[in-house]
Amino acid sequence: MWESICLTLAATAGNNIGKVLQKKGTIILPPLSLKLKVLRAYAENKPWALGFLMDIVGALLMLRALSLAPVSVVQPVSGCGLAILSVFSHFYLKEVMNVFDWIGITVAGIGTIGVGAGGEEQEASLISVFQLLWLALVVAILFVLLNAWLHIFKRQRREQELGEYEVVEEIIYGLESGILFGMASVVSKMGFVFVEQGFSTMFIPMCISISICCSGTGFFYQTRGLKHGRAIVVSTCAAVASIVTGVVAGMFALGEKLPTSPSGRLLLLLGWLLIMLGVVLLVTSSRLIRHLPRSFRRSRQTSLERGFNIRRTTSHTPKDTNPSAVIQAATLHHLLSSPSKDKD
């Protein structure tokens, strides 16, 4: 179990850090196209090439983790990638982090330990075709309802000539993308389960292809939400929906079960909750910090910087203690998902 958790952490770290490096490399690169000159420029850019390689390795490690452990364990642990990205951005990109960022990282880390301590090795159970069809039907109906609800709010916004997105629209885009991300992990795991039950190995590439389609569609919905909506709402809903979908669908469609011992069951459930809480804190930290007294914000920031030996330049004067003056590490991951924001 711990091997699969370590693989998941390494995979999600590779995916998230790889995207940061690719983002850093594209600053001086032209828009990506199929022209040979452009492709050569991307390949010769060391940050982008290294980020792309880390992203690919992360995807392969995630597939390995899914082949060893239940989706109900892998998917929640993958949410800790945001915590790893925050630490990387803090030390490598020199981004300032507030007290809620560190609390979120700590809580997510404790949740990961809980999942590892409570999780149990499980034997592959028979996959019911009826359950798979029922799951596909439920997801399809859910998307029809969400899109119908979205269409209603869009029409009302146009009739009232409102320029900004309603919060319901942001929530819907976040839920749709998160559900698809969770289903992508479930479908990938399904291929390995089919092979374990004696089916053809062709099920693995077939399920992985379907998983890629789910992830791509999820990024499409997330990008639409991030383009006009607030990243804090879209990203929070996507993160929570991804974890919940992976857990519920894994147990329903793949026959995954909770640990048999009461203590293991408690640790696993507590780990799930702590990981989700940590992710929510990381995403909402820039908003939460604004509700603290200014004096407390300044004192906490000073103590954290002293504890972690942050090198402050002369530009980081007290006027920059306002969290809106810097890019928060927790929101950086979600900004990368929007191609429309590559050009500033």
Curated annotation (Swiss-Prot):
Species annotation: Arabidopsis thaliana
Example of a GO biological process term: magnesium ion transport
Residues on Cytoplasmic side: 1-46, 89-98, 147-166, 213-231, 287-344
Family listed: Belongs to the NIPA (TC 2.A.7) family.
Residue spans crossing the bilayer: 47-67, 68-88, 99-119, 126-146, 167-187, 192-212, 232-252, 266-286
Topological category with respect to the lipid bilayer: Multi-pass membrane protein
The UniProt record lists the keyword Membrane: yes
Record InterPro entries: Mg_trans_NIPA
Domain of life according to the entry: Eukaryota
Chief location category: membrane
UniProt GO MF annotations: magnesium ion transmembrane transporter activity
Role, per record: Acts as a Mg(2+) transporter. Can also transport other divalent cations such as Fe(2+), Sr(2+), Ba(2+), Mn(2+) and Co(2+) but to a much less extent than Mg(2+).
PANTHER family, A to Z: MAGNESIUM TRANSPORTER NIPA9-RELATED, PTHR12570
Keywords: Cell membrane, Endosome, Ion transport, Magnesium, Membrane, Transmembrane, Transmembrane helix, Transport
Assembly and oligomerization: Homodimer.
Cellular localization per UniProt: Cell membrane; Early endosome
Extracellular side: 120-125, 188-191, 253-265
Gene Ontology cellular-component annotations: early endosome; plasma membrane
Protein name: Probable magnesium transporter NIPA9
